[in-house]
Amino acid sequence: MNGALCAMRVLAIIPAAGAGVRMGSETPKQFLSIDGVPIVVHTLRKFNEAETIDEIYLGLRPEDMERAHVELQREQFQKPVHLVPGGATRQQTVSLALQKAPSDTEIVVVHDAVRPFVSPEMIHLSVEAARKSGAAIFGVPSVDTVKQVERQTILGTIPRERIVLAQTPQAFRFHIIKEACDRAEADGYDGTDESSLVERLGGAVTVLMGSDRNIKITKPSDLPLARLFFAQEHEQAERREKLLM
């Protein structure tokens, strides 16, 4: 646990059961390597570093289980990482992981497998915000003009000040996200992120300021920027090590 004063558990769920067809590779995007390490492992490292997190649930396709097991053996993470068979959709994968959650779970943090530039600080902030309000996400303002369109015709322009582009991590009190997922499944509703499931039940979701560096690696054009960000992270880590010498 996270100290004597914290009696409840904080879980991270990393849905990684997608095929990654937009990347145009036979290898699922979460297992593409950058600096010799799969993207999903880079992401797991951040959650392993986050003091707020007690354990991690990684949702996978059955055919990726062995590959993930090998990577976890190589990494030897300090925190427990549980491999969970995923579903046909992200929402189903998260629901299956929630079914495995221990009874003393307080907060659930859901994060994209291919957002490896999340910081432990962001993870901590999301957990603290969820403790206060019940649900919290990160978002960044839209710098582009956003149009509402139907059949290739503009219906209107949405004011940019009312728009945020949602990111993960998204954190929730356990009972809130569990009920939202259960209700969505019962109603046949498939949301694009977890916060949308809470919204449809009338739940309030706090928005925290996200980061332009917290990119989601989904297509080939994202890879050069990701490599640049990793190089910068390595340089920063080397500078910190020199200062500690």
Where are these regions (language model features)?
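Residue-level signal for inorganic ion chemistry
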Residues: I14, F31, V40, A97, ...
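Conserved core of the sugar-phosphate nucleotidyltransferase
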Residues: F117-L208, M245
